[in-house]
């Protein structure tokens, strides 16, 4: 038996295309190595000994993929909604993101972010961090340990930001990114 192999039983719902939903009532979805191995009205003999969690009449739906997520912004989500973008960046975002230079702050904030993400419907995500390499690497490690499938990008900023969030030059930023890529 494979290590990451289980089934969920219930009403399975997914979109066949942009206009059509498919429902399989009282059925099984077999998950193998984090992928759907199939949907079955009866559990096939080859899967008879795997763990099955009966979800009753709850809907079983695919996980969500978030293609644009700023991890450091999670700590202050919902604030400054009345501000224009540049005002929001200058008064809220830049001062908050500067805090990620402190690894102890980054660890606390990213722990909350990763834990909440893990307990959400999001199963895959493309995530922006900050320009702080150590904090970005910390976030990557935490997400890898979480079991979520993610990609994390280090932010590069050499202009139009707060002084504490700007790299010295585009060349220095590119060099820092190359070094970061070599190390990960």
Each model region followed by its residue ranges:
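Short, acidic/polar
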Residues: 102-115, 136, 170-177
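Short acidic/polar active-site loop segments enriched in Thr and Asp
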Residues: 123-124
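Alpha-helix C-terminal capping segments
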Residues: 116-120, 145
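Divalent-metal (often Zn2+) His-rich catalytic cores of metallo-beta-lactamase-fold enzymes
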Residues: 129-133
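Metal-coordinating catalytic core of metallo-dependent amide/deamination hydrolases
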Residues: 134-184
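Active-site gating loops and adjacent loop-to-helix segments of metal-dependent hydrolytic enzymes
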Residues: 77-106, 159-170
């Amino acid at each position: 038996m494979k290590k990451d192999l289980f089934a969920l039983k219930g009403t399975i719902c997914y979109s066949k295309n942009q206009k059509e939903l498919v429902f399989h009532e009282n059925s099984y979805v077999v998950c193998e190595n984090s992928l759907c191995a199939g949907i079955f009205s009866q559990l096939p003999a080859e899967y008879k000994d795997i763990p099955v969690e009966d979800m009753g009449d709850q809907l079983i739906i695919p996980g969500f993929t978030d293609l644009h997520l700023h991890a450091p912004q999670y700590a202050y989500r919902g604030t400054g909604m009345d501000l224009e973008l540049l005002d929001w960046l200058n008064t809220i975002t830049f001062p908050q993101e500067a805090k990620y230079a402190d690894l102890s702050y980054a660890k606390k904030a990213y722990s909350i972010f990763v834990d909440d993400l893990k307990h959400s419907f999001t199963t895959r995500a493309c995530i922006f961090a900050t320009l702080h390499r150590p904090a970005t690497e910390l976030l990557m490690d935490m997400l890898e340990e979480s079991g979520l499938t993610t990609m994390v990008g280090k932010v590069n900023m050499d202009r139009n930001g707060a002084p504490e969030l700007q790299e010295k030059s585009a060349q220095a930023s590119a060099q820092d990114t190359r070094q970061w890529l070599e190390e990960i």
